[in-house]
Regions:
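Extracytoplasmic copper-binding redox domains, predominantly the cupredoxin/blue-copper superfamily
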Residues: 2-149
Length: 149
C-alpha cells in the first residue's frame, strides 16, 4: 500500500513538472499564463510552383496563395502570447520528399523539419516591438514579416 502511494506521488510530481514546463514559451524562462493568439501556418505552393507560407489567425482572416505571392505579413500586439501551429501540406513527389520548417530567429522560434502532413506547435511571448523576418531554412523563397506593435 505504501509503495502504491509513492508511485502515485511520483506520477503526480512528474505530471506537474511537465504541465509547468508547457507554460514556458520558447523565448523566456518563466511561465506565462495568458490566452494565446493562435496562428495556423501552412506550407503551400503558388500556381507557378514557388513554395510559400499561408496563415490563418484566431482573430479571423485568411490569406490564400496567389500567383507570384510572397508569404504574408503577420501583425501581433506586444505582450501577447502567440501560439504558432505549423503544418506542412505540400505532398511528396516521386523525385522529392517535402520537408519544410518555420523560424523566427530573434524569438528562438525554430520548428523541426516537417515532412508531409507533419505539424508542430510553438509558443512565444511577443515581448519586444519591431519587424522580424520569418523563414524556412531549406527554401529561401519561403519568408515573410512579423510586425509586433
Amino acid at each position: 500500500m505504501k509503495l502504491i502511494g509513492i508511485g502515485i506521488l511520483v506520477v503526480i510530481a512528474t505530471g506537474s513538472y511537465y504541465a509547468y514546463q508547457s507554460l514556458i514559451p520558447v523565448n523566456v524562462d518563466y511561465p506565462v499564463i495568458l490566452v494565446p493568439e493562435n496562428i495556423l501556418i501552412k506550407t503551400g505552393q503558388s500556381s507557378d510552383g514557388h513554395y510559400l507560407f499561408n496563415h490563418q489567425s484566431s482573430r479571423g482572416g485568411k490569406q490564400v496563395p496567389r500567383s507570384g505571392m510572397t508569404s504574408p505579413t503577420l501583425t501581433i500586439s506586444k505582450g501577447n502570447l502567440v501560439s504558432f501551429h505549423i503544418i506542412n501540406e505540400i505532398k511528396n513527389t516521386p523525385n522529392q520528399k517535402s520537408i519544410h520548417n518555420f523560424n523566427i530567429d530573434e524569438f528562438n522560434v525554430h520548428s523541426k523539419d516537417l515532412g508531409y502532413f507533419e505539424s508542430q506547435s510553438i509558443n512565444f511571448l511577443a515581448d519586444k516591438s519591431g519587424e522580424y523576418a520569418y523563414h524556412c531554412t531549406l527554401h529561401p523563397e519561403m519568408k515573410g514579416l512579423l510586425i509586433i506593435n
